[in-house]
């Protein structure tokens, strides 16, 4: 580009006069609709003299470094006043923010307009609250550092209709999802309630069936007993004599042994199984420990399952040698006639209570005590006497030692007390009150109680399982509390509350700020000039510094941007005009990179870097996401750097000649004095 500089020689007088005349400056907003390029900063003084510098913005400057040795009578830096005026001019440039895009400025009215509005009842100061200003929401205060200047600024967020609609749509979507989730949870809750109700109904029906089955069993058992009594009556009427009666008693006895009821058969099987378990425990110490753990309720589920295997094994084994079952009471046959002499003699010879024998310390046996089931039939073989006998024998065991059946089987009679060795490790199935009951079709008419010596273990009262039962192929080991002890209350489950740390309220964003976490338009105003607000550039690189409250922002200022924009509109108009079909989409201005066009005018640019500080940490995502993606910005900058031309700066002359530049130096000192007078009060001005 040709330099607009006159090469004609001038006198010293002309040079002095030219120093007083400021260079006309082209300002923003004064461009005409012409294609004349923006040459601000490139124009030379038309009336520059033969001085080694030229006057730009009332300041002496040159493209080359200053040479103060050419000055005959050089003034000091203080007397020249160039340095101080240059700082003032630079600060004014930053305050006017010519490197930023102007978004809003306060409108001024003359006196006539103000008087007219006052007559209409309108406050002129409120007119400025326009729609544009209402769209700007304050973000925070900060400090902008540019060059040698530190400028306090106030940041704003520009309200964006597109972001507002997107936020509204997102809130409605969340609300719908919440409603759907609430509805799904309600349906799931209703389904669980119906399922629970159905299970309760099934349980109730099953219980009714069991009751009916029990009644049928009782009726059937009663019918069998009646049939036997009728047969006995017929036999007594037909055959009267001692030989016949004795023969009939023998028949009845043999019949009673061979036709046990289901409850009695179950009792015999359980006694055999317990005897086999005791025999296995004597041979296997590991099984002995396992039995103790299961009885105390300390066995894990795996050990319980393993113990069930031993139970099934003991049930399938042959009874021990010389072992005979012992029924708690023999079948009782009610008769209307007096018992015969032979029956009285046989009853007198039978001992009412078996004689117990002390067990050896090393033997570990499981004891068989009978306890009548709840709600037993009056015709059953269990009586209060047998229950009291078993309780009495249990107390004798606790006080006088353990009683066990003879393992050698000399007498073959089952004893009432189960063994516990001196060390307290008993081969028991559970704590006192543990019973074995059948779960097959017949209801249980008898339960085997397995007493355990109190070893001082508090955990002995714990149940084997949550429901207090271990089922294994029709056999259930149930846990019952001792008589006289209160049932254990269930502990209420209280849901642990989540410990949520109270977030510092000062670090929370408002609802409006949360909308603009991405793609926010940031504006700012200088506190020294609150009448104008400017936009931060979108094509910029933002870098957060170590203190997390400061940011480094770099961008490129294009000086002939107006010329390039006019060229861009012309190219887009031609491209959209040459579209053959209407179906083809037009080229969008935002997607067209004019700097890559081969006929694009030469770009005149200057790189800029500023520092934003004192920004609260909570606004970090808003600030960092307010610019375009870094990759696209780097591509944009690389295109300008490759095809544009960077403007060179000028060097100021901080010293002037006392004679040759006396008028220029005097004017600079006067301007500086007037600027300082503005900071003094009216009283100080009067004193001067």
UniProtKB/Swiss-Prot annotation:
Protein name per UniProt: SWR1-complex protein 3
Family: Belongs to the SWC3 family.
Comp. bias (Polar residues): 341-352, 361-389, 397-413
Assembly, per entry: Component of the SWR1 chromatin remodeling complex.
Single GO molecular function: ATP-dependent H2AZ histone chaperone activity
Role summary: Component of the SWR1 complex which mediates the ATP-dependent exchange of histone H2A for the H2A variant HZT1 leading to transcriptional regulation of selected genes by chromatin remodeling. Involved in chromosome stability.
Region spans: Disordered: 1-48, 174-252, 317-469, 483-504
Keywords recorded for this protein, A-Z: Activator, Chromatin regulator, Coiled coil, Nucleus, Transcription, Transcription regulation
UniProt keyword annotation of Transmembrane present: no
Coiled coil feature spans: 168-225
Biased composition (Basic residues): 488-497
GO biological process: endoplasmic reticulum organization
Biased composition (Acidic residues): 33-46
Location in or out of the cell: Nucleus
Compositional bias of kind Basic and acidic residues: 174-198, 207-233, 454-465
A matching Pfam family: Swc3
GO cellular component, as recorded: Swr1 complex
């Amino acid at each position: 580009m040709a330099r607009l500089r006159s090469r004609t020689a001038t006198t010293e007088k002309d040079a002095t006069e030219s120093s007083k005349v400021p260079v006309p400056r082209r300002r923003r907003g004064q461009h005409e609709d012409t294609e004349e390029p923006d040459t601000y900063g490139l124009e030379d003084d038309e009336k520059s003299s033969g001085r080694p510098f030229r006057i730009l913005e009332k300041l002496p400057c040159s493209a080359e470094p200053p040479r103060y040795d050419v000055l005959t009578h050089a003034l000091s830096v203080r007397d020249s006043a160039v340095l101080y005026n240059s700082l003032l001019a630079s600060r004014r440039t930053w305050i006017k923010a010519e490197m930023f895009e102007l978004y809003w400025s306060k409108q001024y009215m003359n006196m006539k307009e103000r008087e007219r509005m006052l007559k209409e009842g309108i406050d002129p100061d409120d007119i400025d609250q326009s729609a544009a200003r209402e769209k700007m929401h304050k973000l925070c205060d900060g400090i902008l550092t540019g060059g040698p200047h530190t400028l306090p600024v106030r940041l704003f967020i520009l309200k964006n209709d597109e972001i507002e609609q997107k936020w509204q749509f997102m809130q409605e979507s969340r609300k719908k999802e919440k409603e759907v989730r609430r509805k799904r949870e309600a349906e799931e809750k209703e389904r669980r309630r119906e399922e629970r109700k159905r299970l309760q109904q099934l349980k109730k029906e099953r219980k009714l069936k069991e009751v009916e089955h029990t009644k049928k069993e009782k009726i059937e058992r009663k019918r069998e007993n009646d049939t036997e009594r009728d047969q006995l009556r017929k036999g007594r009427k037909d055959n009267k004599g001692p030989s016949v009666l004795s023969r009939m008693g023998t028949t009845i006895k043999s019949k009673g042994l061979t036709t046990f009821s289901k409850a009695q058969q179950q009792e015999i099987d359980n006694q055999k199984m317990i005897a086999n378990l005791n025999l296995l425990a004597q041979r296997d110490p590991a099984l002995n420990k396992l039995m103790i753990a299961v009885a105390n309720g300390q066995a894990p589920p795996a050990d319980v399952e393993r113990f069930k295997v031993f139970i099934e094994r003991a049930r399938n084994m042959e009874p021990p040698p010389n072992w005979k079952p012992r029924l708690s009471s023999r079948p009782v046959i009610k008769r209307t006639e007096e018992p015969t002499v032979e029956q009285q003699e046989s009853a007198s010879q039978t001992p009412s209570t078996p004689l117990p024998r002390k067990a050896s310390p090393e033997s570990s046996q499981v004891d068989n005590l009978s306890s009548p089931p709840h709600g037993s039939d009056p015709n059953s073989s269990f009586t209060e006497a047998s229950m009291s006998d078993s309780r009495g024998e249990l107390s004798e065991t606790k006080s006088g030692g353990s009683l066990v059946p003879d393992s050698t089987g000399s007498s073959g009679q089952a004893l009432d007390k189960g063994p516990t060795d001196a060390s307290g490790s008993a081969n028991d199935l559970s704590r006192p009150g543990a019973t074995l009951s059948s779960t097959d079709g017949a209801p249980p008419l008898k339960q085997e109680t397995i007493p355990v010596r109190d070893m001082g273990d508090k955990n002995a009262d714990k149940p084997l399982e949550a429901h207090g039962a271990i089922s294994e192929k029709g056999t259930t080991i149930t846990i019952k509390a001792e008589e006289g002890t209160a049932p254990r209350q269930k502990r209420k489950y209280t849901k642990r509350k989540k410990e949520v740390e109270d977030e510092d309220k000062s670090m929370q964003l408002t609802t409006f700020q949360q909308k603009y976490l991405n793609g926010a338009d940031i504006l700012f105003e200088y506190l020294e000039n609150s009448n104008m607000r400017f936009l931060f550039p979108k094509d910029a690189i933002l870098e957060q510094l170590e203190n997390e409250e400061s940011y480094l922002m770099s961008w490129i200022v294009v000086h002939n941007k107006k010329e390039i924009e006019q060229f861009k509109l012309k190219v887009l108009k031609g491209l959209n005009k040459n579209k053959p079909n209407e179906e083809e989409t037009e080229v969008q201005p935002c997607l067209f990179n004019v700097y890559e066009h081969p006929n694009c005018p030469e770009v005149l640019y200057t790189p800029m870097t500023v520092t934003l500080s004192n920004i609260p940490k909570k606004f970090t995502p808003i600030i960092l996401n307010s610019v375009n993606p870094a990759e696209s910005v780097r591509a944009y900058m690389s295109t300008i750097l490759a095809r544009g031309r960077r403007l060179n700066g000028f060097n100021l002359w901080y010293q002037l000649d006392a004679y040759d530049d006396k008028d220029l130096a005097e004017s600079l000192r006067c301007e500086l004095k007037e600027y300082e007078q503005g900071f003094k009060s009216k009283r100080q001005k009067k004193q001067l």
